[in-house]
Amino acid sequence: MSQPSNSGGGASKGIVKILILAMLAIGIIGLPVGLYEIGTLIATHMAVGDIENGYAYGGLMSIIYNATHISQYQQLSQILPATGVTMGTQDITTIQIFLLLLGLFLDAPLAYMTYNIYRHLEDE
């Protein structure tokens, strides 16, 4: 009696399928979330500079106002710190969203390739 030519290897093929599905799940979720977190780290570093500059320029305008008593400098001394905080917040949001979308766009080919590998294993 002859045995089928593809006998054996069923357990290892099952483990490979499970690993491919796990890689697919980690890739689909992990890549966008990881890039989002990297964006948060980078943007927070950038935002600190914006906030420091806003408060520094606000303090400078306050000193100039105290020396000249021109009301525009007083207004600038009050507005510039808030402007620095706003710019810092915009930095964080922009970079987070950009890297999240980049992760989602990079995710599609990764998921497609992984699915094709899984489907190829199913056909064997």
Curated annotation (Swiss-Prot):
Superkingdom of origin organism: Viruses
GO (cellular component) term, any one: membrane
TM ranges: 15-35, 92-112
Topological relation to the membrane, as annotated: Multi-pass membrane protein
Subcellular location per the Swiss-Prot or TrEMBL entry: Host membrane
Main location: host cell
Keywords: Host membrane, Membrane, Transmembrane, Transmembrane helix
UniProt name for this protein: Putative transmembrane protein 57
Lineage: Viruses, Adnaviria, Zilligvirae, Taleaviricota, Tokiviricetes
